[in-house]
Amino acid sequence: MTKSVEGLVSVVLGAQWGDEGKGKLVDLLSESCSVVCRCQGGNNAGHTVVAGGQEYFFHLLPSGIVNPNVLAVIGNGVVVNLQALFQEIDEAVCKGLLDVSSRLRISDRCHLVFDIHQEIDRMEEELRGENSLGTTKKGIGPTYSSKVTRNGLRVCDLMGDWVQFTAKYKELVKYVKRRYPKLGINVEESLEKLSGMVCDSVILINKLVKSKQANILVEGAQSCMLDIDFGTYPHVTSSNCSVGGVCTGLGLSPSRVGRVYGVIKAYTTRVGSGPFPSELLDGIGEFIQKKGCEWGVTTKRKRRIGWLDTVVIRYAHIINDFNALALTKIDVLDDLEEVKIAKAYIDPETGRELDSFPSDSSVLNHVVVVYETLPGWKTSTHGCRVYEELPTAAKVFVETVEKLLNIPIRWIGTGASRDSIIIRSV
């Protein structure tokens, strides 16, 4: 890992529509970190890490917890489903992770996801019919709605007076005019499990930053194009997945954010509905989907496939100002005769190139995409660990992407395992 500026926090963010392979970069960078944090989202996120021959699926736990020397922090911007969290902890322990509970800290300001939120999520998606947003139905959006309307419940409420907590929960149910459901958790057992993990994460993180003794890494969930403000609204998630969410989701000053790393796939994927200019609806897309094992970690839904879209990534760069990029899954493209890169959008009515990323999804749905077409390399890149080992055409692909984006590509993923990665000195 590039040495962090003393006292500053490093951040890993997705620059497409999620599922870029952020977990792999976090796993690599966390080897030289002492603290890894989540700052937003909930168990609608899905990170996969392959370590020691074991495959781990993370939804709420920071994936950097795979490193046994890391303290994992779930920040105040995360919404927490306790059942899902405890199940994830149990599964991680069963797979051999050590001291998970003792290495985990949960902000007492985290809002709680209840079954009522999940039921609202399901019902709202059904009511939308063919205009559904394709949510994970995990109750994340309704929980953030409760937070914004100021009738949500937080971890600190659960840890406080139970009578008051019950009264607040009844008010929540009354507000959304739903029948009082069961919590679906054993409250006393949950309190016992939580007792050693809950803390004021704002104080904890800022003390660690000011001490200049902790190397802190923040792993973003979802991605910039799913950001509630900057994504392809309304087909977005309910939190800020961009660099601003790091500050609000952890209680950090912007001046504490040091390096920001973006993660992109060598192609593009998207789960659920929403505009997707470079989408492939032919046999090539189907081939990439199968070879890349493109199924949602959380939803198990088949991911939509498209060519790498540099218009999207340039827009994400404007918002996040990436210091460097990780390009993942280049090996999935090994068998293709040619590879395309989206480099511009044309307005079909005027014939002119758009000078900015459209905020209106209806406009984005109708843009004409301009592609750069490159020859495929027709040679396996799987497991390559040195840049010079890549076929010439694969290196041309990487360098063309760099040129179109004007951002250095420091890491190149060449397989699922944690050591299938090329680290470039750029």
From Swiss-Prot:
Keyword Signal: no
Active site residues per record: 19, 47
Subcellular location: Cytoplasm
SUPFAM superfamilies documented for this protein: P-loop containing nucleoside triphosphate hydrolases (SSF52540)
GO biological process: 'de novo' AMP biosynthetic process; IMP metabolic process
Known cofactor(s): Mg(2+)
Gene3D superfamilies linked: Adenylosuccinate Synthetase, subunit A, domain 1 (3.40.440.10), Adenylosuccinate Synthetase, subunit A, domain 2 (1.10.300.10), Adenylosuccinate Synthetase, subunit A, domain 3 (3.90.170.10)
Cofactor note: Binds 1 Mg(2+) ion per subunit.
Keywords annotated in UniProt: Cytoplasm, GTP-binding, Ligase, Magnesium, Metal-binding, Nucleotide-binding, Purine biosynthesis
Enzyme class: ligase
Keyword Ligase: yes
Gene Ontology CC, one term: cytoplasm
Binding site for Mg(2+): 19, 46
Primary localization class, coarse: cytoplasm
Family, per entry: Belongs to the adenylosuccinate synthetase family.
Protein name: Adenylosuccinate synthetase
Organism of provenance: Schistosoma mansoni
Upper classification of the organism: Eukaryota, Metazoa, Spiralia, Lophotrochozoa, Platyhelminthes
